[in-house]
């Protein structure tokens, strides 16, 4: 088992600011803002991390951590990188009130929870979790409600999701990556898109729903602020054409009350799930 130590922490700081030999290791650690503990084969992060009370950025990716370290009471931390570990649960984050970016990609998490204290969280990456057969990523309502006003970037790609309806209350979203999931219903997707009035970038490729006739056009009409869809810029003329067609031909994609996508023969929606 590889565990962190004061010596390892001192060796893992920025080359710009090396320790003054007149200072003890403990004194030095109290001054650092960035800590590079990535790719150290770490199984555990010890209590010595609490010495780093000015830490704003912590790199812990590409290790062997099975849980989020319990000593992360770092009140100044804004960026936490934990991707490529073996973490199975989101916990021990309640004291990180200034955290803005949380990277948890490629772990073993099946429930997105434990985010209640992250009142400034702007970016969350939980893509490509190692899930058991038949499982898909689950979202805790309380956690999502707590970040609904601040979260602008979310990556949930590669998690076997069959719907994005659990994410509808994340009304501050600007960028969402939901690619390579199992989303099938264009109706459900349209409902969600109508709730994300600020969404400018959306990735949905690699989902069965994109085999629906005119799927891209349906998405563009429902996501009125969208500028980029699957890495392709939506031109102003393209959007105007689709909106005019919708208004003139009666291709009714706008949802109100009990939502439903309808269309005329002219636009040929195909099979809507």
Task: Please name every model-derived segment.
Residues 1-64, 70, 74-79, 86, ...:
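Long, contiguous C-terminal flanking segments immediately downstream of a protein's structured core
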Residues 89, 111:
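Basic (Lys/Arg-enriched) interaction patch that binds polyanionic ligands
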